[in-house]
Amino acid sequence: MSVRIDEPQLFVSMSKEPTQETVNVGGHHDDSSSNCDERVDDQTEEQKSPPASPDLTANLNVFDLESRQKVVQRLLNSQLNLSNLRAPLNLPPIFQALQGPFSIQQQLLGLASGLTAISPGLDDYDEENTNQGEPEDLTLGGFRKETSVKSEEPSESGINASGPAWSYEEQFKQLYELSDDVKRKEWLDDWLNFMHRIGKPVTRIPIMAKQVLDLYELYRLVVQHGGLVEIINKKLWREITKGLNLPSSITSAAFTLRTQYQKYLYDYECEKEKLSNQSDLQQAIDGNRREAPGRRTAPSFPLPFQLPHAASAAATMLNNQLNGLGMRNDLLDDENTLSLQASGLFGTSYGAEQMAILEAHQRNLERAQRAVQQQVARQSLGLTACSNGNGGNIHNSGRESTSSNDSDIPAKRPKLENDVKTNGASSMRISTKHSDNSKTSMSVSMEINGITYQGVLFALDETVSES
């Protein structure tokens, strides 16, 4: 194959090995390369090559081309392993390489970038592939930019929507369409602007009983009844619930309405109506918390005055069961503990307005307890006097009588031991007798409250007692 340069017709034979290259001057060349010459001539005519250069310049270009072709040939044979590739036509190695993969073409074009003046088709191919890649990248980048711009447009509109200049009716459409009241739109616009101005912008609509809570109607009803503080003090939430057409089965409807009103509408009420302030609201909430029905464990009517008498009657009944003398200190302590627990329970349950009545009842209860204790003390003094009067008879029995008092109660009723010891006011008769043998025995007979107890006591040996 030969490459035609221009006038004067210079041909470079590239069909032989690079070492056997020859330069022919003239208008004739081999027939085997005529087709390639015609193809190259067509390319040169399409690219409109510059005018012919002088002979010296043409020779220099030819030798420059040969040196670059040698470099390309070595690259293809050694590094790219293309020595075995065969083209359909006997093309030069540089054209054979251009028919290979695109990555190889890029490397080859990078090395042969200086051949643009001689083979203009290479630059066209390079620009064509470059132009094929760039629009795809640009299209992808443009698509990403367009999608990012489209995604940013709603956020920008949302930012504008949060501003006071944006129409609230589009964002809170449900509130505006709850009724046909002509003042609704005006009030909602003014309220939403006010909340935005004080730094508490409304971001959502409260829901109650699976429906939108009509804040406009809630505000109107509360103001008609005197404001939030008045509603809390007078407990008028049932009327508010009926006015809002909420179902009566809602649990804690009063608490929910109060919290929603306090969050969304109370600041607006203080600004426009000036019916109360934050301190009044806090006092009303605290008072309502103290009087909350869930915190009451007793009825709201005053305590009956029969409570001290009932306590004294219970004490009298215990006194009768224990013969009027056996009121132990532990029972009195239990009674005091119960009374204190009851008073503490009532004190936590009742409000401040009932504490005075409770204290009066507690004082009456304490007086009744003191009366019971004094009665027990007087009976104890009488018991001591009786025991002193019978001391001679008991003392005559000596050690045996003492041991009899310690062991005259059966084992089944050990708790009555103290009662028997102190029960000297009842009739008691003790008779003893001794047996004939050396061991002394004593027959004891006692009558207590009409019941006679009788038994025989034996003296213990000293050896047995020591063991």
Swiss-Prot record:
Keywords: Developmental protein, DNA-binding, Nucleus, Transcription, Transcription regulation. One of its GO terms (cellular component) is nucleus. It is found in: Nucleus. Residues 181-273 form the ARID domain. The lineage of its organism: Eukaryota, Metazoa, Ecdysozoa, Nematoda, Chromadorea. Residues 421-430 have a biased composition (Polar residues). The keyword DNA-binding applies. SMART domains: ARID, BRIGHT. This is AT-rich interactive domain-containing protein cfi-1. It comes from Caenorhabditis elegans. Induction: By unc-86.
